[in-house]
């Protein structure tokens, strides 16, 4: 089983999930993506580039591939590069095509956080604790550490490109993937930049219509479901893989 983290995160985000899955009998690996955890960025940070970076450190095809947020982009890139590369695929909070102003806002946010974590780490810790009161201390630690170990520049550039690009929609790429992915989506009504879901209502409805029954699962929580609702996340994944 291979776990791929999201933007501004690192493999440590799976601190609870990885051991819990291992206790259920899975051989679990988690990778740091390009531009995260001290790894360099070579080329673009689009789906193809992210997939190539994953293969550089984990060339073995997994029985199960799980990605969160940016990790779902990498996962889709892996399946577009080699259909059927994984036995089963679970996408936690795959991001919809974002409005231009949201892309630009995220570019500014990740750049500002990279400065804040160097200049006022304690302040950033306090902000995340305030914004995410239900997170475990370890979740807060790894969230901050992920920001500290990220190179925001290539991702900010990519977000600015996406603000002007008319790319293929998320549902189209998910439905075309082989094997057909399972999607875990947050039920939160909050905006994405406030911790809400990255999957739009329109894309969610399209996926519900086009995916096989049982392939779209909604969980109570925000964008980081494996932090917000770890027990429900594990139960959903166990049900999918049983």
Question: Residue ranges of each PLM-predicted region?
Answer:
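Alpha/beta-hydrolase active-site loop signature
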Residues: 8, 32-37, 72, 96, ...
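Catalytic histidine-centered segment of alpha/beta-hydrolase-like enzymes
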Residues: 218-230, 234
């Amino acid at each position: 089983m291979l776990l791929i983290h999201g933007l501004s995160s690192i493999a440590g985000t799976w601190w609870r999930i990885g051991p819990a899955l291992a206790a259920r009998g899975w051989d679990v690996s988690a990778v740091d993506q390009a531009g995260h955890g001290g790894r360099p960025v070579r080329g673009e940070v689009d789906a193809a580039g992210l997939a190539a970076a994953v293969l550089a450190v984990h060339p073995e095809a997994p029985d199960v591939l799980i990605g969160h947020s940016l990790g779902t982009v990498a996962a889709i890139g892996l399946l577009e590069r080699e259909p059927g590369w994984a036995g089963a695929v679970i996408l936690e909070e795959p991001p919809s095509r974002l409005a231009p102003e949201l892309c630009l806002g995220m570019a500014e946010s990740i750049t500002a956080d990279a400065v804040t974590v160097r200049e006022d780490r304690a302040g950033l810790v306090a902000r995340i604790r305030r914004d995410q009161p239900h997170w475990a201390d370890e979740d807060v630690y790894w969230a901050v550490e992920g920001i500290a170990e990220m190179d925001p520049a290539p991702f900010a550039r990519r977000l600015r490109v996406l603000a002007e690009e008319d790319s293929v929609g998320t549902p189209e790429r998910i439905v075309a993937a082989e094997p057909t992915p399972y999607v875990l989506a947050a039920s939160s009504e909050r905006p994405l930049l406030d911790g809400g879901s990255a999957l739009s209502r329109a894309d969610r409805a399209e996926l519900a219509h086009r995916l096989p029954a049982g392939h779209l699962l909604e969980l109570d929580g925000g964008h980081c479901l494996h932090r917000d609702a770890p027990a429900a996340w594990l139960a959903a994944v166990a049900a999918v893989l049983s």
